[in-house]
Amino acid sequence: MNRTDELRTARIESLVTPAELALRYPVTPGVATHVTDSRRRIEKILNGEDKRLLVIIGPCSIHDLTAAMEYATRLQSLRNQYQSRLEIVMRTYFEKPRTVVGWKGLISDPDLNGSYRVNHGLELARKLLLQVNELGVPTATEFLDMVTGQFIADLISWGAIGARTTESQIHREMASALSCPVGFKNGTDGNTRIAVDAIRAARASHMFLSPDKNGQMTIYQTSGNPYGHIIMRGGKKPNYHADDIAAACDTLHEFDLPEHLVVDFSHGNCQKQHRRQLEVCEDICQQIRNGSTEIAGIMAESFLREGTQKIVGGQPLTYGQSITDPCLGWEDTERLVEKLAFAVDTRF
């Protein structure tokens, strides 16, 4: 009989289950309290109950755990310094959506060489998240793959659905199940309505199929996530200006949704020129000083060293520098965070 299935499968490998990985790297009571408390604080900011600003900042992607931990340690100092004005959360992105092809992140390819040791990547991701949370720094990530979230979601305080997947039904269903607040980016063309539709969908109950923590295929029914919000990330042109934010809030109001959102300083808003994140910051700070309460949070891409680098076989990587989108360096990071804190002073 002719084969009709698995005709294009080149490799099959057993995968550790989420439950097995959690036994190796268990959540401690202290970390569980930290994650729970961080989520509650973020929810209050998104609901307008807390006047502070949510600041989600960090490398475009994680590729080096040592550099990531150094960044987290420095970020914790900024958290302590500005905790009365800012809720600082570290970007810990392990999955990268690609327009065509490219490195897909630490979980898929931790060795950066196409060997795709996914089991090792999942282990590294969970290990790092535990260490960062143990420092007292909340973590944020993009939920891209429908399965890998099962391995790390218990350690995440804030999640994102990216511009390429906000319109996806299965990602909206996944967001409805997540235990953390979830931001939906506007589309790559700048369309914010798809993000509003995603928020509405994620607030509803859904049923979908997914493996559970033990790897058993399961029918999940969700209760819905009430903490969805827009991430203004720009598109063909920036959309961080006051009129753009007002227009997005008008759409939220139309559907009786909270009129609070997050502005991404990078991506379409900086037109892929990383230093322009500082210009976006200046504009947002002025909007806050002018009395804007709609801006609940911001996102920015920064690392220890400015810029980006290519992966070249046989050549060492520059420590603390991004291998995906270019990032601000640490000195600019400190200035950016300081400016945000001073702007938020006017809310008190």
From Swiss-Prot:
Record Pfam families: DAHP_synth_1
Disulfide pairings: none
Family listed: Belongs to the class-I DAHP synthase family.
Record InterPro entries: Aldolase_TIM, DAHP1/KDSA, DAHP_synth_1
SUPFAM superfamilies: Aldolase
GO cellular component: cytoplasm
Reactions mediated catalytically: D-erythrose 4-phosphate + phosphoenolpyruvate + H2O = 7-phospho-2-dehydro-3-deoxy-D-arabino-heptonate + phosphate
Keywords for this protein: Amino-acid biosynthesis, Aromatic amino acid biosynthesis, Transferase
Group of enzyme by EC: transferase
GO BP of this protein: amino acid biosynthetic process; aromatic amino acid family biosynthetic process; chorismate biosynthetic process
Entry function: Stereospecific condensation of phosphoenolpyruvate (PEP) and D-erythrose-4-phosphate (E4P) giving rise to 3-deoxy-D-arabino-heptulosonate-7-phosphate (DAHP).
Pathway linked to the protein: Metabolic intermediate biosynthesis; chorismate biosynthesis; chorismate from D-erythrose 4-phosphate and phosphoenolpyruvate: step 1/7
Species for this entry: Shigella flexneri
Enzyme Commission number(s) from the entry: 2.5.1.54
GO molecular function: 3-deoxy-7-phosphoheptulonate synthase activity
Designated name of the protein: Phospho-2-dehydro-3-deoxyheptonate aldolase, Trp-sensitive
